[in-house]
């Protein structure tokens, strides 16, 4: 299993519109992606947000993660994406 770790900044003035885009556009697309296992979007603090999305393979994670998938939401800027193999789960 592999994780896509996404760092982003959120414009607080556009947070409600960003949350709506997440729920109505991004989540459905990610859930239906090949190899999707689970996803977690953490509430932003001081304009900084994170998501952790798990896939069966690294290739599937790379094909779905931004900017390849064109994740777009008002007031959101993707500041970085890393891919890691999941070492353990509990």
Where are these regions (language model features)?
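Short S/T/G/P-rich N-terminal loop/turn motif that feeds into the first structured element of a domain
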Residues: 1-49, 56-67, 76-90
């Amino acid at each position: 299993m592999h994780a896509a770790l996404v760092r982003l900044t959120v414009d607080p003035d556009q947070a409600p519109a960003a949350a709506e885009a997440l729920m109505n556009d991004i989540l459905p697309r990610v859930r239906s992606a090949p190899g999707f296992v689970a996803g977690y979007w953490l509430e932003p603090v001081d304009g900084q947000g994170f998501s952790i999305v798990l896939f069966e393979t690294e290739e599937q994670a790379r094909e779905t993660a931004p900017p390849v998938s064109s994740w777009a939401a008002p007031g959101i800027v993707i500041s970085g994406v890393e891919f890691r193999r999941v070492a353990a789960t509990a």
